[in-house]
Protein backbone atom coordinates (compact mmCIF):
# COMPACT_ATOMS: atom_id res chain seq x y z
CA UNK A 1 0.00 0.00 0.00
CA UNK A 2 1.48 3.35 -1.08
CA UNK A 3 1.08 6.49 0.99
CA UNK A 4 0.30 9.95 -0.41
CA UNK A 5 3.94 10.38 -1.45
CA UNK A 6 3.93 7.17 -3.50
CA UNK A 7 6.07 5.44 -0.91
CA UNK A 8 5.71 2.15 0.92
CA UNK A 9 4.94 2.47 4.60
CA UNK A 10 2.90 4.57 6.98
CA UNK A 11 3.37 8.35 7.00
CA UNK A 12 4.51 8.30 10.62
CA UNK A 13 7.33 5.96 9.62
CA UNK A 14 8.38 8.16 6.69
CA UNK A 15 10.78 11.04 7.18
CA UNK A 16 10.43 13.95 4.76
CA UNK A 17 12.80 16.90 4.50
CA UNK A 18 11.02 20.06 3.32
CA UNK A 19 12.99 22.88 1.72
CA UNK A 20 11.56 25.88 3.59
CA UNK A 21 12.24 29.28 2.04
CA UNK A 22 9.99 31.19 4.43
CA UNK A 23 7.34 31.78 1.80
CA UNK A 24 3.74 30.61 1.77
CA UNK A 25 4.32 27.76 -0.70
CA UNK A 26 7.03 25.87 1.17
CA UNK A 27 5.30 26.62 4.49
CA UNK A 28 2.06 25.03 3.29
CA UNK A 29 4.04 22.08 1.94
CA UNK A 30 5.47 21.46 5.40
CA UNK A 31 2.07 21.96 7.06
CA UNK A 32 0.31 19.57 4.68
CA UNK A 33 2.82 16.80 5.22
CA UNK A 34 2.80 17.32 8.98
CA UNK A 35 -1.02 17.15 9.01
CA UNK A 36 -0.86 13.83 7.15
CA UNK A 37 1.35 12.38 9.86
CA UNK A 38 4.76 12.41 8.20
CA UNK A 39 7.98 12.87 10.16
CA UNK A 40 8.79 16.33 8.76
CA UNK A 41 12.12 18.12 9.05
CA UNK A 42 12.43 21.67 7.73
CA UNK A 43 15.66 23.00 6.24
CA UNK A 44 16.33 26.58 5.18
CA UNK A 45 19.42 27.47 3.20
CA UNK A 46 21.20 30.74 3.91
CA UNK A 47 22.49 31.50 0.45
CA UNK A 48 23.91 35.02 0.55
CA UNK A 49 24.54 38.07 2.73
CA UNK A 50 21.04 39.04 3.75
CA UNK A 51 21.80 42.46 5.21
CA UNK A 52 20.58 44.68 2.40
CA UNK A 53 17.52 42.58 1.63
CA UNK A 54 16.35 41.71 5.12
CA UNK A 55 13.04 43.56 5.07
CA UNK A 56 12.59 44.32 1.39
CA UNK A 57 9.32 43.08 -0.12
CA UNK A 58 9.61 40.83 -3.14
CA UNK A 59 13.04 39.44 -2.27
CA UNK A 60 13.40 35.69 -2.13
CA UNK A 61 15.41 34.02 0.64
CA UNK A 62 16.09 37.26 2.51
CA UNK A 63 16.88 37.43 6.24
CA UNK A 64 13.21 37.92 7.08
CA UNK A 65 12.46 34.69 5.23
CA UNK A 66 14.69 32.69 7.57
CA UNK A 67 12.83 34.21 10.50
CA UNK A 68 9.47 33.33 8.90
CA UNK A 69 10.54 29.76 8.17
CA UNK A 70 11.65 29.30 11.76
CA UNK A 71 8.32 30.63 13.06
CA UNK A 72 6.35 28.29 10.80
CA UNK A 73 8.42 25.32 11.95
CA UNK A 74 7.81 26.24 15.59
CA UNK A 75 4.07 26.49 14.98
CA UNK A 76 4.03 23.10 13.27
CA UNK A 77 6.24 21.54 15.93
CA UNK A 78 8.85 20.25 13.52
CA UNK A 79 12.65 20.37 13.69
CA UNK A 80 14.14 23.21 11.65
CA UNK A 81 17.72 23.78 10.58
CA UNK A 82 19.39 26.71 8.84
CA UNK A 83 22.40 25.69 6.76
CA UNK A 84 25.05 28.16 5.64
CA UNK A 85 25.52 27.71 1.89
CA UNK A 86 26.85 31.18 1.09
CA UNK A 87 30.21 30.04 -0.29
CA UNK A 88 28.69 27.26 -2.38
CA UNK A 89 25.95 29.57 -3.70
CA UNK A 90 28.46 32.24 -4.62
CA UNK A 91 30.62 29.77 -6.53
CA UNK A 92 27.82 27.88 -8.30
CA UNK A 93 25.26 30.61 -8.93
CA UNK A 94 26.47 34.18 -8.45
CA UNK A 95 29.87 33.78 -10.13
CA UNK A 96 28.31 31.91 -13.05
CA UNK A 97 25.62 34.58 -13.33
CA UNK A 98 28.20 37.35 -13.69
CA UNK A 99 30.38 35.32 -16.06
CA UNK A 100 27.39 34.56 -18.27
CA UNK A 101 26.48 38.23 -18.62
CA UNK A 102 30.11 39.08 -19.31
CA UNK A 103 30.00 36.55 -22.16
CA UNK A 104 27.02 38.28 -23.76
CA UNK A 105 24.42 35.86 -22.44
CA UNK A 106 21.22 36.36 -20.44
CA UNK A 107 21.35 33.70 -17.70
CA UNK A 108 18.58 32.20 -15.57
CA UNK A 109 20.16 31.84 -12.10
CA UNK A 110 17.14 30.04 -10.62
CA UNK A 111 17.83 27.06 -12.88
CA UNK A 112 21.41 26.74 -11.65
CA UNK A 113 20.28 27.17 -8.05
CA UNK A 114 17.78 24.34 -8.41
CA UNK A 115 20.28 22.13 -10.21
CA UNK A 116 23.36 22.64 -8.06
CA UNK A 117 22.07 23.72 -4.66
CA UNK A 118 18.50 22.61 -3.97
CA UNK A 119 18.43 19.37 -5.96
CA UNK A 120 22.13 18.73 -5.57
CA UNK A 121 23.51 19.66 -2.17
CA UNK A 122 20.22 19.85 -0.26
CA UNK A 123 19.05 16.52 -1.64
CA UNK A 124 22.29 14.95 -0.43
CA UNK A 125 21.73 16.47 3.02
CA UNK A 126 18.19 15.08 3.10
CA UNK A 127 19.53 11.59 2.43
CA UNK A 128 22.09 11.99 5.20
CA UNK A 129 19.26 12.89 7.59
CA UNK A 130 17.53 9.62 6.75
CA UNK A 131 14.72 11.18 4.74
CA UNK A 132 12.84 9.06 2.22
CA UNK A 133 12.15 12.10 0.03
CA UNK A 134 12.83 15.82 -0.32
CA UNK A 135 9.68 17.92 -0.75
CA UNK A 136 9.53 21.47 -2.10
CA UNK A 137 6.88 24.11 -2.71
CA UNK A 138 7.45 24.33 -6.46
CA UNK A 139 4.43 24.53 -8.74
CA UNK A 140 5.16 21.41 -10.72
CA UNK A 141 4.24 17.75 -10.30
CA UNK A 142 5.72 14.31 -10.75
CA UNK A 143 3.93 11.14 -11.79
CA UNK A 144 4.86 7.49 -11.38
CA UNK A 145 5.44 5.77 -14.72
CA UNK A 146 4.74 2.13 -15.55
CA UNK A 147 8.38 1.18 -14.96
CA UNK A 148 8.36 2.75 -11.49
CA UNK A 149 10.35 5.84 -12.44
CA UNK A 150 8.86 9.30 -12.26
CA UNK A 151 7.97 11.91 -14.87
CA UNK A 152 8.00 15.68 -14.38
CA UNK A 153 4.76 17.35 -15.46
CA UNK A 154 3.40 20.89 -15.53
CA UNK A 155 1.44 22.25 -12.59
CA UNK A 156 -2.34 22.49 -12.52
CA UNK A 157 -2.00 26.26 -12.08
CA UNK A 158 -0.64 27.26 -15.48
CA UNK A 159 0.00 30.82 -14.30
CA UNK A 160 2.31 29.53 -11.55
CA UNK A 161 3.90 26.61 -13.38
CA UNK A 162 7.65 26.43 -12.68
CA UNK A 163 8.57 23.53 -14.94
CA UNK A 164 10.78 25.79 -17.08
CA UNK A 165 13.14 26.27 -14.13
CA UNK A 166 13.35 22.55 -13.32
CA UNK A 167 14.27 21.09 -16.71
CA UNK A 168 17.78 20.21 -15.49
CA UNK A 169 16.42 17.83 -12.84
CA UNK A 170 17.78 14.34 -13.43
CA UNK A 171 15.87 11.06 -13.38
CA UNK A 172 17.63 10.04 -10.17
CA UNK A 173 16.69 13.31 -8.50
CA UNK A 174 13.07 13.01 -9.66
CA UNK A 175 12.76 9.65 -7.93
CA UNK A 176 13.65 11.36 -4.64
CA UNK A 177 11.68 14.60 -5.07
CA UNK A 178 8.05 15.34 -4.29
CA UNK A 179 5.98 18.43 -5.15
CA UNK A 180 2.79 18.42 -3.03
CA UNK A 181 1.46 21.70 -4.52
CA UNK A 182 1.53 20.55 -8.13
CA UNK A 183 -2.21 19.92 -8.28
CA UNK A 184 -3.21 23.13 -6.49
CA UNK A 185 -3.74 26.75 -7.46
CA UNK A 186 -2.14 29.66 -5.65
CA UNK A 187 -5.45 30.83 -4.11
CA UNK A 188 -5.99 27.31 -2.77
CA UNK A 189 -2.52 27.32 -1.23
CA UNK A 190 -3.11 30.66 0.48
CA UNK A 191 -6.44 29.41 1.83
CA UNK A 192 -4.71 26.35 3.26
CA UNK A 193 -2.15 28.62 4.91
CA UNK A 194 -4.98 30.47 6.63
CA UNK A 195 -6.57 27.22 7.78
CA UNK A 196 -3.25 26.11 9.23
CA UNK A 197 -2.93 29.48 10.96
CA UNK A 198 0.31 30.42 9.24
CA UNK A 199 1.35 34.06 9.47
CA UNK A 200 2.80 33.90 5.95
CA UNK A 201 -0.62 33.27 4.37
CA UNK A 202 -0.68 36.71 2.73
CA UNK A 203 3.06 37.17 2.32
CA UNK A 204 4.15 38.65 -1.01
CA UNK A 205 5.61 36.29 -3.58
CA UNK A 206 9.30 36.62 -4.41
CA UNK A 207 9.78 38.57 -7.64
CA UNK A 208 13.44 39.43 -7.93
CA UNK A 209 16.73 37.63 -8.29
CA UNK A 210 17.34 36.79 -4.64
CA UNK A 211 20.98 37.91 -4.47
CA UNK A 212 20.34 41.31 -6.09
CA UNK A 213 18.83 43.26 -3.16
CA UNK A 214 18.70 46.57 -5.05
CA UNK A 215 17.09 45.07 -8.14
CA UNK A 216 20.08 46.30 -10.21
CA UNK A 217 21.82 43.15 -11.38
CA UNK A 218 24.55 45.24 -13.05
CA UNK A 219 25.86 46.12 -9.57
CA UNK A 220 26.80 42.47 -9.07
CA UNK A 221 28.25 42.10 -12.56
CA UNK A 222 30.27 45.30 -12.30
CA UNK A 223 31.85 44.08 -9.08
CA UNK A 224 32.65 40.54 -10.23
CA UNK A 225 33.24 41.13 -13.97
CA UNK A 226 34.18 44.82 -14.43
CA UNK A 227 35.10 44.18 -18.07
CA UNK A 228 31.40 43.64 -18.79
CA UNK A 229 30.78 47.28 -17.84
CA UNK A 230 33.41 48.79 -20.14
CA UNK A 231 32.06 51.30 -22.69
CA UNK A 232 31.77 50.49 -26.38
CA UNK A 233 29.93 51.25 -29.60
CA UNK A 234 26.35 50.67 -30.64
CA UNK A 235 26.30 49.79 -34.35
CA UNK A 236 23.75 48.73 -36.96
CA UNK A 237 23.84 45.48 -38.95
CA UNK A 238 26.25 47.07 -41.43
CA UNK A 239 28.67 48.18 -38.73
CA UNK A 240 27.74 51.87 -38.86
CA UNK A 241 28.25 53.53 -35.47
CA UNK A 242 24.98 54.87 -34.04
CA UNK A 243 25.99 55.65 -30.49
CA UNK A 244 27.84 54.46 -27.40
CA UNK A 245 27.03 52.22 -24.44
CA UNK A 246 28.34 51.84 -20.90
CA UNK A 247 28.76 48.08 -20.78
CA UNK A 248 27.47 45.04 -22.65
CA UNK A 249 25.98 43.67 -19.44
CA UNK A 250 23.32 46.40 -19.64
CA UNK A 251 21.80 44.76 -22.73
CA UNK A 252 20.07 41.58 -23.79
CA UNK A 253 18.88 40.21 -27.12
CA UNK A 254 15.54 41.73 -28.11
CA UNK A 255 15.93 44.83 -25.93
CA UNK A 256 14.44 48.04 -27.33
CA UNK A 257 14.27 50.46 -24.42
CA UNK A 258 17.30 52.23 -23.01
CA UNK A 259 19.42 52.22 -26.17
CA UNK A 260 19.83 55.99 -26.10
CA UNK A 261 19.96 56.39 -29.87
CA UNK A 262 17.67 58.22 -32.26
CA UNK A 263 16.44 56.38 -35.35
CA UNK A 264 13.63 56.70 -37.84
CA UNK A 265 12.30 53.24 -36.96
CA UNK A 266 12.40 51.13 -33.79
CA UNK A 267 15.69 49.31 -33.25
CA UNK A 268 16.37 46.22 -31.15
CA UNK A 269 19.48 44.56 -29.79
CA UNK A 270 20.23 41.64 -32.13
CA UNK A 271 23.80 40.75 -31.15
CA UNK A 272 26.31 41.29 -28.35
CA UNK A 273 29.90 41.12 -29.61
CA UNK A 274 32.01 40.65 -26.51
CA UNK A 275 35.33 40.64 -28.38
CA UNK A 276 34.79 44.14 -29.80
CA UNK A 277 32.47 45.36 -27.02
CA UNK A 278 29.88 46.21 -29.66
CA UNK A 279 26.12 46.17 -29.23
CA UNK A 280 24.56 45.44 -32.63
CA UNK A 281 21.04 46.72 -33.27
CA UNK A 282 18.58 46.18 -36.09
CA UNK A 283 14.90 46.07 -37.06
CA UNK A 284 12.49 43.71 -35.35
CA UNK A 285 12.56 41.21 -38.21
CA UNK A 286 16.27 40.70 -37.57
CA UNK A 287 15.30 39.00 -34.31
CA UNK A 288 13.34 36.25 -36.02
CA UNK A 289 14.78 32.83 -35.24
CA UNK A 290 13.94 29.39 -36.61
CA UNK A 291 17.00 27.44 -35.49
CA UNK A 292 18.88 27.32 -32.20
CA UNK A 293 21.76 25.21 -30.92
CA UNK A 294 21.91 23.91 -27.36
CA UNK A 295 24.49 22.99 -24.74
CA UNK A 296 24.24 20.99 -21.52
CA UNK A 297 21.15 19.12 -22.69
CA UNK A 298 19.33 17.10 -20.02
CA UNK A 299 16.92 14.36 -21.12
CA UNK A 300 14.20 12.98 -18.82
CA UNK A 301 11.91 11.64 -21.52
CA UNK A 302 11.58 7.96 -22.40
CA UNK A 303 14.62 5.99 -23.49
CA UNK A 304 18.00 7.38 -24.51
CA UNK A 305 18.22 10.88 -25.98
CA UNK A 306 20.26 10.06 -29.08
CA UNK A 307 17.96 7.20 -30.00
CA UNK A 308 14.88 9.37 -29.47
CA UNK A 309 16.10 12.17 -31.74
CA UNK A 310 18.02 10.15 -34.33
CA UNK A 311 15.42 10.81 -37.05
CA UNK A 312 14.21 14.07 -35.51
CA UNK A 313 11.76 14.26 -32.63
CA UNK A 314 8.61 16.35 -32.89
CA UNK A 315 7.84 18.09 -29.61
CA UNK A 316 7.08 21.48 -28.08
CA UNK A 317 9.61 23.91 -26.63
CA UNK A 318 9.59 26.96 -24.43
CA UNK A 319 12.48 29.37 -25.04
CA UNK A 320 11.58 31.79 -22.26
CA UNK A 321 9.71 31.28 -19.00
CA UNK A 322 7.02 33.81 -19.94
CA UNK A 323 6.28 32.31 -23.36
CA UNK A 324 4.07 29.31 -24.13
CA UNK A 325 5.48 26.12 -25.65
CA UNK A 326 5.52 26.04 -29.44
CA UNK A 327 5.96 23.24 -32.02
CA UNK A 328 9.54 22.28 -32.79
CA UNK A 329 11.86 19.51 -33.94
CA UNK A 330 14.83 18.27 -31.92
CA UNK A 331 17.80 16.73 -33.75
CA UNK A 332 21.39 15.83 -32.97
CA UNK A 333 23.71 13.33 -31.33
CA UNK A 334 26.79 13.02 -29.13
CA UNK A 335 26.20 16.22 -27.20
CA UNK A 336 25.45 18.37 -30.26
CA UNK A 337 21.76 19.22 -30.47
CA UNK A 338 19.71 21.64 -32.51
CA UNK A 339 16.10 22.78 -32.29
CA UNK A 340 14.09 23.88 -35.29
CA UNK A 341 11.23 26.22 -34.32
CA UNK A 342 8.35 25.52 -36.69
CA UNK A 343 6.76 28.96 -36.39
CA UNK A 344 9.91 30.84 -35.45
CA UNK A 345 10.50 33.05 -32.44
CA UNK A 346 11.78 36.56 -31.73
CA UNK A 347 14.44 37.64 -29.28
CA UNK A 348 15.92 34.24 -28.46
CA UNK A 349 18.90 34.90 -26.21
CA UNK A 350 21.95 32.71 -25.47
CA UNK A 351 22.03 31.69 -21.82
CA UNK A 352 18.28 31.23 -21.59
CA UNK A 353 16.81 27.73 -21.42
CA UNK A 354 15.03 25.82 -24.15
CA UNK A 355 12.72 23.37 -22.39
CA UNK A 356 11.12 20.34 -24.08
CA UNK A 357 7.48 19.30 -23.56
CA UNK A 358 5.29 16.56 -25.00
CA UNK A 359 2.30 18.91 -25.39
CA UNK A 360 1.65 22.61 -25.88
CA UNK A 361 -0.63 23.07 -22.88
CA UNK A 362 -2.32 21.38 -19.95
CA UNK A 363 -0.48 18.91 -17.76
CA UNK A 364 2.29 18.42 -20.30
CA UNK A 365 5.25 16.21 -19.46
CA UNK A 366 8.67 17.82 -19.31
CA UNK A 367 11.09 15.89 -21.52
CA UNK A 368 14.20 17.86 -20.58
CA UNK A 369 15.93 20.82 -22.15
CA UNK A 370 19.20 22.66 -22.59
CA UNK A 371 20.78 26.09 -22.50
CA UNK A 372 20.68 28.13 -25.68
CA UNK A 373 24.14 28.37 -27.21
CA UNK A 374 23.30 30.32 -30.36
CA UNK A 375 20.44 31.31 -32.62
CA UNK A 376 20.25 31.95 -36.35
CA UNK A 377 18.01 34.93 -37.04
CA UNK A 378 16.55 35.94 -40.39
CA UNK A 379 16.79 39.54 -41.52
CA UNK A 380 14.25 40.42 -44.20
CA UNK A 381 15.44 43.23 -46.47
CA UNK A 382 13.20 45.84 -47.98
CA UNK A 383 13.37 43.90 -51.26
CA UNK A 384 11.75 40.95 -49.52
CA UNK A 385 14.85 38.77 -49.53
CA UNK A 386 15.76 36.73 -46.48
CA UNK A 387 19.37 36.98 -45.36
CA UNK A 388 20.27 34.34 -42.76
CA UNK A 389 22.90 35.48 -40.31
CA UNK A 390 24.08 34.32 -36.93
CA UNK A 391 23.21 37.35 -34.86
CA UNK A 392 22.43 36.02 -31.42
CA UNK A 393 25.56 34.03 -30.63
CA UNK A 394 27.84 35.95 -28.25
CA UNK A 395 31.38 36.39 -29.53
CA UNK A 396 33.81 35.69 -26.72
CA UNK A 397 37.15 37.36 -26.50
Swiss-Prot record:
One of its GO terms (molecular function) is tRNA-uridine 2-sulfurtransferase activity. Residues 160-162 are annotated as: Interaction with tRNA. It catalyses: S-sulfanyl-L-cysteinyl-[protein] + uridine(34) in tRNA + AH2 + ATP = 2-thiouridine(34) in tRNA + L-cysteinyl-[protein] + A + AMP + diphosphate + H(+). GO terms for biological process: tRNA wobble position uridine thiolation. Coiled coil: none annotated. It comes from the Bacteria. InterPro entries: MnmA-like, MnmA-like_C, MnmA-like_central, MnmA-like_central_sf, Rossmann-like_a/b/a_fold. The active site is at 113 (nucleophile), 210 (cysteine persulfide intermediate). CDD domains: MnmA_TRMU-like. Keywords: ATP-binding, Cytoplasm, Disulfide bond, Nucleotide-binding, RNA-binding, Transferase, tRNA processing, tRNA-binding. Gene3D superfamilies: Adenine nucleotide alpha hydrolases-like domains, HUPs, Translation factors. ATP binds at residues 19-26, 45, 137. Its main location: cytoplasm. Pfam families: tRNA_Me_trans, tRNA_Me_trans_C, tRNA_Me_trans_M. Disulfide bonds join 113-210. One of its GO terms (cellular component) is cytoplasm. It is found in: Cytoplasm. Its EC number is 2.8.1.13. Catalyzes the 2-thiolation of uridine at the wobble position (U34) of tRNA, leading to the formation of s(2)U34. Belongs to the MnmA/TRMU family. This is tRNA-specific 2-thiouridylase MnmA. It comes from Bradyrhizobium sp. (strain BTAi1 / ATCC BAA-1182). The gene is mnmA.
Amino acid sequence: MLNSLDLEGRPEDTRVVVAMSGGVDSSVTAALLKSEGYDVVGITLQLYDHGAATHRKGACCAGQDIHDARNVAERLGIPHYVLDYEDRFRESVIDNFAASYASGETPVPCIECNRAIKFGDLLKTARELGASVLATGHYVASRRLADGSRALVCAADADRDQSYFLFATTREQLDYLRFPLGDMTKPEVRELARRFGLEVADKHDSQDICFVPTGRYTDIIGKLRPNAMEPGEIVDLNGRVLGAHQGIANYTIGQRKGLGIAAGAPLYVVKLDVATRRVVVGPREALRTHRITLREVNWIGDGVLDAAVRDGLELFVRVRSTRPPQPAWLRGADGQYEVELVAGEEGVSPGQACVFYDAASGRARVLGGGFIQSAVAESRTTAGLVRPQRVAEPVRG
